[in-house]
């Protein structure tokens, strides 16, 4: 596992203050088609509760609420949640720490964690909390970055001699099997893995225009289709709640 820590979390500041400062300066957003694709993977049904843990600016929650889904966004940063709530109707918002989620056990039908556990102080504890709030037959959709993504870190290292740093306070990269071991240790059962290689087929008119004006995206999409799973840029883990955590030692996983 590769770890990056910025001075904002090594000095006197906290991760929360670092993220508040981060969101005051910029937004963390992907194309809408990315979030719609994740919702397709989650398959929310009428009456179910969807919780996006570490939702950031809350765009996925906003898109879910527009489609009549009972959606709740949860994030460490007050600044991020405040911005999300100002732009969204029909959703609920809570500020808190993903390592100690203030929700009762087995309360959520769907839990999403999209590019967030790798930024936690204790990622395994974050996985435990996702498993705890998930209902016994619930579904978790968890996106995590690959240390050896062909179009991601491997390409970036070839050019720069170092892994990509997205400027968040702290970041980690790992292989598929290391992330799977962490999720199992947290009490999640990995039922499937879907690759994400920085491209989604457009699902909105705006994203269609954006895509067709960037022909290089089609090249990336073609490469992504033939890229082996273990070289994907990111992994989307489709999980259920395990009967019990798997405490087995995994030498590549340094976190308890």
State where each predicted segment sits.
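Conserved N-terminal segment of class I S-adenosyl-L-methionine
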Residues: 1-100, 112, 127, 232-235, ...
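Short N-terminal helix/helix-N-cap motif within the alpha/beta-hydrolase-1
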Residues: 79, 120-125, 152
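A short SAM/SAH-binding and catalytic strip from SAM-dependent methyltransferases
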Residues: 110-121
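A short glycine-rich, Lys/Arg-flanked "PGG" loop and its adjoining helix->strand segment in the class I
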Residues: 124-139
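Conserved class I S-adenosyl-L-methionine
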Residues: 141-163
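A C-terminal cap/extension of S-adenosyl-L-methionine-dependent methyltransferases
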Residues: 155-161, 181, 192-256
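Acceptor-substrate binding/catalytic loop of class I
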Residues: 160-178
């Amino acid at each position: 596992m590769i770890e990056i820590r910025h001075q904002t979390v090594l000095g006197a500041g906290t991760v929360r203050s670092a993220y508040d400062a981060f969101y005051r300066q910029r937004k963390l957003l992907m194309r809408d088609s990315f979030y719609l694709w994740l919702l397709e993977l989650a398959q929310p049904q009428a009456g179910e509760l969807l919780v996006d843990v570490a939702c950031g600016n809350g765009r996925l929650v906003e898109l879910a609420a527009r489609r009549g889904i009972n959606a709740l966004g949860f994030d460490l940063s007050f600044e991020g949640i405040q911005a999300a709530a100002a732009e969204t109707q029909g959703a609920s918002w809570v500020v808190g720490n993903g390592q100690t989620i203030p929700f009762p056990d087995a309360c959520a039908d769907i839990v999403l964690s999209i590019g967030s556990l790798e930024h936690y102080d204790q990622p395994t504890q974050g996985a435990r909390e996702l498993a705890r709030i998930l209902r016994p037959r619930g579904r978790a959709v968890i996106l995590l970055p690959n240390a050896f993504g062909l179009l991601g870190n491997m390409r970036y290292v070839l050019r720069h001699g170092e892994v990509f740093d997205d400027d968040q306070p702290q970041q980690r990269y790992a292989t598929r099997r290391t992330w799977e071991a962490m999720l199992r240790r947290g009490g999640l059962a990995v039922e499937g893995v879907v690759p994400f290689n920085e491209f989604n087929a457009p699902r909105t008119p705006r994203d269609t225009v954006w895509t067709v004006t960037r022909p290089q995206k089609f090249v990336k999409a073609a490469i992504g289709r033939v890229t082996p799973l273990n070289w994907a840029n990111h992994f989307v883990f489709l999980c259920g709640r395990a009967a019990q955590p798997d405490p087995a030692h995994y030498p590549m996983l340094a976190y308890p």
